[in-house]
């Protein structure tokens, strides 16, 4: 079977995941490596109708194909005690959609880059919830539904807050908070991300996000290219 490599970016809001993913993809393509943005149709930047339709399609396919694992995932999300019922539904749909996309990626050759993959979804579940169920959700993923590599875009909470205050788009929930509350929430998110990364069962590489986007993208592309040339493949 042709080689595949699923890579996810993760980091605080404002770290530049979308910008870096697109630029890294272009750099990899220039190096002769086939690379797609695997979750672009369900990302926050996608048109709302397309995002919801694509997410619903993926979540439905995953739930009908793997009902037992879907039931276990639903129980874990419910146990996380999300702050609002609508959040419970939303994060479960996001989780199932990412599982479905990953399964498809591992059946397709090339590099598949996720702006927000497994770890970022766990971060969202943890940030909005009152109880940590990340270990249960990791256990919910068979190898074909895990990324092969996690690239953490490291950015201090203070810098993330400064970037978000100057950003015209409103993709992050924390942008609706006042300055002090935003910084507190980002600091909490920074601690949570550190905990999740420490418990991540797949390889992790850290890239500083306090540099220009082009420099970040160049480093991410280098990391991915090294992994690709090393022949890392998901177990089948």
Name every feature range the model reports, one short phrase each.
Residues 25-80:
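N-terminal phosphate/diphosphate-binding loop that engages ATP/GTP or pyrophosphate donors
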Residues 120-133, 140-191:
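A glycine- and Lys/Arg-enriched "phosphate-lid" helix/loop adjacent to the NTP-binding pocket
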Residues 162-236:
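NTP-dependent small-molecule kinase module
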């Amino acid at each position: 079977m042709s080689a595949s490599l699923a890579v996810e970016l993760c980091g605080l809001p404002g770290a530049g995941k979308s910008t870096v993913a697109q630029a890294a993809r272009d750099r990899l393509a220039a190096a002769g490596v086939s690379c797609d943005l695997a979750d672009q149709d369900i990302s926050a930047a996608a048109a709302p109708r397309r995002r919801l339709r694509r997410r619903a399609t993926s979540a439905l396919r995953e739930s009908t194909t793997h009902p037992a694992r879907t039931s276990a995932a639903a129980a874990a999300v419910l146990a996380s005690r999300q702050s609002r019922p609508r959040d419970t539904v939303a994060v479960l749909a996001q989780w199932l959609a990412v599982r479905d996309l990953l399964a498809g990626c591992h059946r397709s050759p090339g590099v598949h880059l996720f702006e927000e993959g497994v770890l970022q979804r766990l971060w969202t579940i943890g940030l909005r919830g009152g109880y940590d169920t990340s270990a249960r959700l990791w256990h919910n993923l068979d190898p074909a539904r895990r990324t092969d590599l996690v690239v953490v875009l490291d950015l201090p909470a203070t810098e993330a807050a400064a970037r978000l205050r100057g950003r015209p788009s409103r993709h992050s929930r924390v942008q609706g908070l006042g300055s002090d509350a935003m910084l507190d929430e980002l600091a909490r998110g920074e601690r949570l991300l550190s905990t999740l990364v420490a418990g991540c069962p797949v390889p992790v590489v850290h890239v500083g996000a306090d540099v220009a986007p082009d420099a970040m993208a160049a480093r991410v592309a280098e990391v991915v290219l090294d992994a690709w040339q090393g022949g890392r493949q998901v177990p089948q």
